[in-house]
Amino acid sequence: MEIGISKYRNIGIMAHIDAGKTTTTERILFYTGKQNRIGEVHDGAASMDWMEQEKERGITITSAATTCFWNDHRVNIIDTPGHVDFTIEVERSLRVLDGAVAVFDGVAGVEPQSETVWRQADKYSVPRICFVNKMDRIGANFYRCVDMIKTKLGAAPLVIHLPIGSEKDFKGIIDLISMKAIIWQEETLGAKFSYEDIPSDLLDKAQEYRNLLLDAAAEMDDEAMNTYFESNDLPVDLLKKCVRNGTIKGKFVPVLCGSAFKNKGVQPLLDGVVDFLPSPIDVDVIVGIDPKDSEKKIEVKPSEKEKFVALAFKVMTDKFVGSLTFIRIYSGKLKSKSTVSNALKNETEGIGRMLLMHANNREDITEARAGDIVALVGLKKTTTGDTLCSVDFPILLERMEFPEPVIEIAVEPKTTSDQEKLGIALNRLVAEDPSLRMSVNAESGQTILKGMGELHLEIIVDRMKREFNVEANVGAPQVAYRETITKSVEIDYTHKKQSGGAGQFAKVKIKFEPLEPGSGFQFESKIVGGAIPKEYIPGVENGLELIKEGGIISGFPLIDFKATLLDGAFHEVDSSPLAFELAAKGAFKEMANKAGPKMLEPIMKVEIITPEEYMGDVMGDINSRRGNVADMLDLGNNSKIITASVPLANMFGYINVLRSMSQGRAQYSMHFSCYEQVPQYVVDELKLEYN
């Protein structure tokens, strides 16, 4: 069925782990007719969770993409993981979406990962609507949840639905736009519902919230403002138009509610997606740059009549078709069997098959156009973040930024015959997941895997076994420590070597200085007047790039410093890029102990939800882990949220300690916050361990 681009909705479903994202998606697929039975996460039958590990653990690891239809609109949905170790999946999904549905647990409200995901959506200016889920659960409180959206996320919630009843008495919702109650029929699994008059005991509250809705909506449009002044009301179509405008401009976020598991509130949520979230033509124009001239900006218009431009946002291996590259098409058309250009790599790629994905089921298609999200089979050189475009229209879209890993493990094959298979498996997995890094320890020869958390690496090792049949021995997780300097120093260094034949000569004067946390390594050359020929200067930068990886104190990479090449000298015969590389390394070694080197460790932001009676034990334990409690919040229901900063080194295996301390009733999540200096007594212990 041919649907115009104005009726496309490319959306993501995002939330904290266990807020009910995948269940909500399953209901959407059921009610839009994509599935004829409902899959449940706790049965391991959810169709969007298709990896074996997802079915076993009941969590979503990769972003599954699917397409469905609602009220003559085409809705492309990406279901994203809520576990903090898989934040990268959320990041790359948000990069290619036009709108999002943020799902909140009606009991817990705004949880740590909800904040992380919300910040990511802010970064890409993704308009969103909120769905307060699990309104049937004990302790569910819609109004507290709305308040948390305001206070914890700094958002402007605009209430569209009110719940009728709560916990086991949750029956349906009041739609403030139509001012009707919607009640679902249990026996039809929520497929049938009726519009009724609002219960008399809720009329005043409904009118109060509708007035707030009208006030906010009328400000979006002059015509609406005039109508509102004259009649103190707005017609439904104009009210929807105003809410849509405000949502797309980011002025407010509509808040809806329901219980996906109990089949209530999902159809109005779909209406909200269609009514309030943008189509590809409603969002800001995408701007790229000319690969040959980064100053030259190129606008990409969302029309199939324009040249083809797309972004590859995910690469994965499928056991039936091989490598799959997911792309979002921003303009133009793409036909299977055609040739496109990878602008970043300056290579052409042949398009083999083109697939429309439903979780891991696939449907072959021959053409896709602006607004579509499709998977391509057989691309050889394209990786996550690359731009694909017409061969005669070179353009680069903004690349995605991926976080640095904070934890590492050593892996080695159990048998020597598995060595080659291990290499193939890891190369495939690293190609799929930009937050996974692989390197080989020069001294031990061990393969080192770096990732975003224990669960992340655990699942990678599990996938090596299941998908590639590689059994590996895995070392204990290690913290990704870093080193930095605290003082500025200038070093004059001359590298001279004379042995029969051509010698080596290079002289450098380099200023080393500390930078703000998070700055990484910066290099600048201030050479003027040819003191060092310009073809030798990259040798200096390369030497520093290589030697900084070995650090100063205990062999960890040196970060957050700047090296400025101030002066130097060369020899007509004996100088070379290699000589200047060696001179730079010599200057670095001389700087090492003069610049006040310090060790840094990753600090995690930890949020713990615990029953009140275990508060004392939990806080005492946090203090014993060198943690600092930053905040405590009362959740009601005899529960508290504790927010703390704790060194990652002291958080391994924490879940088991927390469970035994709270008889399994407390839960926690954590994400990387920053690098901080390691106390001296810990440095002394680490020196013994690592040297």
UniProtKB/Swiss-Prot annotation:
InterPro entries assigned: EF-G-like_DII, EFG_II, EFG_III, EFG_III/V, EFG_IV, EFG_V, EFG_V-like, G_TR_CS
Entry-linked PANTHER family: RIBOSOME-RELEASING FACTOR 2, MITOCHONDRIAL (PTHR43261:SF1), TRANSLATION ELONGATION FACTOR G-RELATED (PTHR43261)
Entry keyword set: Cytoplasm, Elongation factor, GTP-binding, Nucleotide-binding, Protein biosynthesis
Residue ranges of domain tr-type G in the record: 6-281
Major subcellular location class: cytoplasm
Coiled coil: none
Annotated Gene Ontology cellular component terms: cytoplasm
GO MF assignments: GTP binding; GTPase activity; translation elongation factor activity
PROSITE patterns reported for this sequence: G_TR_1, G_TR_2
GO process terms (BP): ribosome disassembly
Function per UniProt: Catalyzes the GTP-dependent ribosomal translocation step during translation elongation. During this step, the ribosome changes from the pre-translocational (PRE) to the post-translocational (POST) state as the newly formed A-site-bound peptidyl-tRNA and P-site-bound deacylated tRNA move to the P and E sites, respectively. Catalyzes the coordinated movement of the two tRNA molecules, the mRNA and conformational changes in the ribosome.
Family statement drawn from the similarity comment of this UniProt entry: Belongs to the TRAFAC class translation factor GTPase superfamily. Classic translation factor GTPase family. EF-G/EF-2 subfamily.
The protein's name in its UniProt record: Elongation factor G
Location(s), subcellular: Cytoplasm
Keyword Thylakoid: no
Family matches, as Pfam families: EF-G_D2 (PF22042), EFG_C (PF00679), EFG_III (PF14492), EFG_IV (PF03764), GTP_EFTU (PF00009)
Residues the record lists as binding GTP: 15-22, 79-83, 133-136
